[in-house]
Structures are given as structure tokens and as C-alpha cells.
Amino acid sequence: MSALTPHVYWAQRHGEIYLRVEISDAQDLSIGVEENILQFRGQGHGAKGENEYEFSLEFLKPVKPEVKHKSTQRQVNITVRKQEEVWWNRLTKQEKKPLFLAPDFDRWLDESDAEMELREKEEKINKVSFESRVRKDPFLGLKKGFLFMYNLVQFLGYSWIFVNMTVRLFILGQDSFYDTFHTIADVMYFCQMLAIMEVINPAVGLVKTGVMPAFIQVMGRNFILFVIFGSLEDMQNKPVVFFVFYLWSTIEIFRYPFYMLACIDTEWKLLTWLRYTIWMPLYPLGVLAEAVAVIQSIPIFDETKLLSIPLPKATGLSLSFSYILQLYLVVMFLGLFINFRHLFKQRTRRFRTKKRKAN
């Protein structure tokens, strides 16, 4: 009777080979490397039920004889170190891949991603080494306390907005759309004025984020709030105000508590997932709502000549502010594409790192 072979999944880094053998409740394991050939034998429950399984793999290039393995209820994980830290084009010396062997997509990285992972590890080691040599900031506790309180105040403010608007929507229905500004504006003004701190904090080194992304977001929102809604009474009774405010507050009631917990070195996995996921539908919807507000304001600015720039008296004309708004619309959707791509990469990097740690 021919020997039974289990399903084996593999992945690599520059210095290591990872094998995942699909045998549950494995016993009597015999795993070793001789003359660059990995020999595996073990009893357990695999693709052919409860049996003894075995396989051998002749590696493409030399590996170290020491083999690390860990058996769990579901599988056997094997780690083999390469003699040289180089990237392999394939796992085995023979070009034709064994039928039982397949890529482990849970751990799979292409060469460029693996190089990026190496750089991240080196940067982390260098950072830890540097921080161990540098005297700790005596004001670190004060800074964290300030940031915690800032995020707490913003969370409470946006939570009040979100709850107030939700309750009014259930009680009044669509009628709540038309007086949102007069009911919510004071708290929204407060939160958005306070949000200027999100530009100041990175500028003075309180947080390690870019100044420009924060500036674009804060100034973009304040432009909609103070110029489009605040300066035009005709805009304040439009339903679009409800949708803009509701989308803003929905995003922030997840973002600010995430930052609050980060200030005290705490993580709530569900909140982290929401922080890096909920923006995917809400951010484009928010930009769309802001664009609708800008479009609806253009004829009002044309009619009232508000904020128009007067030209020389000889012409008797003025440059309408609506031209600036039309240009702003183009910039807004360009910013949507750039920011969406940036946020998606940030999300991918965040969860890929967490997945590696879990493995």
C-alpha cells in the first residue's frame, strides 16, 4: 500500500521557509532534514481520515539541519531556516510541484512585500535601540493626558450630535432634515473649531502624523461648515445639511475612541476594525454629500454676489465666487481618489501586520 500524503501549504521569507501540514491531533511525529531533504512522518487525522501520513521535500537550495515544529489541534507548523537569506523562485529542486503542495496564502508575500517587511523589522529594531538610548520624555504623561482629554471631548461632542440627530429622525422623520442646522450647528461649530488642534498637534510634535492630511480634512470640513452653510441662510434649511452632519458624526464616533485608547496603550479589536473599515462606505458618501452642498450653493452665490471679487470699475463686472466653487469640486474629487488610496493602503498595512503577529 502506497504511503498517504497530507496537504502541505508553504510560504517563505528571505531567511525562512514555513510549512503548514494539514493533520489534526498529530502524534508520533518524526520531522528532520538530511542532505537537504525534509522528511515528515506522523499519525493523525488528515485528508484520508485517521492514518499515518508522510512526505519528503528536496529543497531548491541548502537549508540548515535544525527544524522547528509546533503541533496544534488543527495542523503542524514547520519552520526551516535557509543557509543564505535569499529569495527562492520555487520551493523544491524538481521543477514540477508535488501534487500535495500548495501556496499558503494566509502567510504569502511576494518578494517586494517581503523586502518591505524586512525593512519594517529593521526600522523597529533601530527605533527600539534609539529609544533605549534616549532619555524618556518627562512630559510624556502630560502629553498623553492632554491628547486623551482632547479626543474624549471630541467623542462626546460628536456622540451628542449623532444621538440627537438619530432620535430626531425617528421622532420627526423627514421633517428633521430641514432644521438640522439650527439644532446642531452650535455643537458642530465647537467641534470643528476644536478640530484645528489636529493640525497643531502634529505641527508641534505631539503626534507622529502628517500635518498636511490633517490640514486638508479640517479645512475642507470648515469650508463646508462656515462658508457653504454658515454664510448662506438659504442653505441652512436644505436636507443636505442633515446628511453631511450625520456622515461626519458617524465617522468620528469610531475614530476618536480609537485614539483615546491609543493614548493609554490599549486596543479594542472590534473598534480597531471599525476604525479602519467603516470609512470605506462613509468617506465617499461624505464627499458626495459635501459636493451636493457645494453644487446647491453655486446659484445662491451667483444670485447674491456674496464673496464675489470685484473687477476694475471700467468693466462693471465681478468675478463670481461660484467659479472658485467649481474649481473646488474638481479638487474635492481628486482628493477623494488620493485619500481613498492612502487610507486603503493604511488599512491593508495595519491588518497585514496584525495577521503576521497572529501567525
Curated annotation (Swiss-Prot):
It is an enzyme of class 4 (lyase). It is a multi-pass membrane protein. It catalyses: a very-long-chain (3R)-3-hydroxyacyl-CoA = a very-long-chain (2E)-enoyl-CoA + H2O; (3R)-hydroxyhexadecanoyl-CoA = (2E)-hexadecenoyl-CoA + H2O. It is found in: Endoplasmic reticulum membrane. Pathway: Lipid metabolism; fatty acid biosynthesis. Pfam families: PTPLA. The chain crosses the membrane at residues 145-165, 187-207, 210-230, 240-260, 278-298, 318-338. The keyword Flavoprotein does not apply. GO terms for biological process: fatty acid elongation; sphingolipid biosynthetic process; very long-chain fatty acid biosynthetic process. PROSITE patterns: CS. Residues 109-133 form a coiled coil. The active site is at Y283, E290. Catalyzes the third of the four reactions of the long-chain fatty acids elongation cycle. This endoplasmic reticulum-bound enzymatic process, allows the addition of two carbons to the chain of long- and very long-chain fatty acids/VLCFAs per cycle. This enzyme catalyzes the dehydration of the 3-hydroxyacyl-CoA intermediate into trans-2,3-enoyl-CoA, within each cycle of fatty acid elongation. Thereby, it participates in the production of VLCFAs of different chain lengths that are involved in multiple biological processes as precursors of membrane lipids and lipid mediators. Belongs to the very long-chain fatty acids dehydratase HACD family. This is Very-long-chain (3R)-3-hydroxyacyl-CoA dehydratase. It comes from Danio rerio (Zebrafish). The lineage of its organism: Eukaryota, Metazoa, Chordata, Craniata, Vertebrata.
